[in-house]
Amino acid sequence: MLPKAAWSLVLRKGGRGRRGMHSSEGTARGGGKTPRYTNCYAQRHYPMPEEPFCTELNAEQQALKEKEKGSWTLLTHAEKVALYRLQFNETFAEMNRRSNEWKTVMGYVFFFFGFAALVIWWQRVYMFPPKPITLTDEWKAKQLQRMLDMKVNPVQGLASRWDYEKKQWKK
Amino acid sequence: MAPEVLPKPQMRGLLARRLRFHMVTGFVLSLGVAALYKVGVADKRKKAYADFYRNYDAMKDFEEMRKAGIFQSVK
């Protein structure tokens, strides 16, 4: 199977990302535009998308794009920021911001743990058959007594914890 | 944003720094874990076995088991 990194690339790039790589069909489309999927914006693992963020430019922005074709030292700081914003949706700092989503996720996880526990409890009370004979308390007591008689694991294990003189567990 | 000048970030040697940190840390942690294992598990176990067998009487042990009735060949 594909390695995990390849799968995440396949899933996350969305339709536009994959097709946009090969074809002139993007530019040949002309008037129509493929709908922008939410995951086509830049992400940490996909920092340079093919399409710029703003494709419809007003006159002022068009002029700026023309100026960009010349020497970049002539651009003012504000113009550079404006060009960045045309190209990208968010800065790296904005894109990488933390969120509180994990709390919601953990909440749902624990809720469903609890729900599953209630379901299993109900099943235990109303559905489970009687225990096999080897799991009843009397049988387990006799089994333990036999293991102690045999001195199972006398060095560091079970029989080493039993006090044979006082007939009780060692403190 | 106000045009304050941020200090220039570290531009070079980033991989080297990361490698150095992780190699040192890995080395120290590995040695530490190995030492703790030797003392806490291996030596402790050797001592437990030595103490057990120092005054061990196999026949006495056998008699106790026989009296408890677990054998099929001797009663």
From Swiss-Prot, chain B:
- Residue ranges, Mitochondrial intermembrane side: 55-75
The way this protein sits in the membrane is described as:
Single-pass membrane protein
Q: Name one GO cellular component term.
A: mitochondrial inner membrane
Mitochondrial matrix face residues: 1-13
- Record's keyword terms, sorted: Membrane, Mitochondrion, Mitochondrion inner membrane, Transmembrane, Transmembrane helix
| InterPro entries, per the entry | Cytochrome_c_oxidase_VIc, Cytochrome_c_oxidase_VIc/VIIs, Cytochrome_c_oxidase_VIc_sf
Q: How does it assemble?
A: Component of the cytochrome c oxidase (complex IV, CIV), a multisubunit enzyme composed of 14 subunits. The complex is composed of a catalytic core of 3 subunits MT-CO1, MT-CO2 and MT-CO3, encoded in the mitochondrial DNA, and 11 supernumerary subunits COX4I, COX5A, COX5B, COX6A, COX6B, COX6C, COX7A, COX7B, COX7C, COX8 and NDUFA4, which are encoded in the nuclear genome.
- Identification of the protein by name: Cytochrome c oxidase subunit 6C
Q: Which organism is it from?
A: Macaca silenus
